[in-house]
Amino acid sequence: MISTFALFWALCIVCIINMARYYSSLRVLLLVLRDCDPLLYQYVDGGGFFTSHGQPSKQIRLVGYIYAQRYLDHHDPEFIRRCERVRGQFLLTTALCGLIVISLIAMMIWY
């Protein structure tokens, strides 16, 4: 039988790997955004997005832009493809983090 703790840690590792993939895809999306739509790049603070002085309100704007699928009207197909990829990875990572929290609560109750 598979250990519950081993399964939990495997789930955590998968979640961390997906977070790294999401982070990498978001960086590439910002590079594509800088070339195809400089105004939107400035609107979401693309240059300072991953810095310590980045503005969270502008970062949330980009997340909202992608989550609401407002990118579908964009003129660049590469940008649309990158946004769809980032959106899928965001939803997957969110679901995995939720599953980890639920399994952690279940393990606390069970043991």
Swiss-Prot record:
Name of one Pfam family that matches: UspB
Gene label: uspB
Superkingdom of source: Bacteria
Family that this chain belongs to: Belongs to the universal stress protein B family.
CC terms in the record's Gene Ontology section: plasma membrane
Organism: Pectobacterium carotovorum subsp. carotovorum (strain PC1)
Residues spanning the membrane: 1-21, 90-110
Protein location: Cell inner membrane
Keyword Membrane: yes
InterPro entries the UniProt entry points to: Universal_stress_protein_B
Main location: membrane
Protein name: Universal stress protein B
Membrane topology annotation: Multi-pass membrane protein
Chain segments annotated as coiled-coil in the UniProt record: none
Source taxonomy: Bacteria, Pseudomonadati, Pseudomonadota, Gammaproteobacteria, Enterobacterales
Keywords: Cell inner membrane, Cell membrane, Membrane, Transmembrane, Transmembrane helix
Keyword Methyltransferase on entry: no
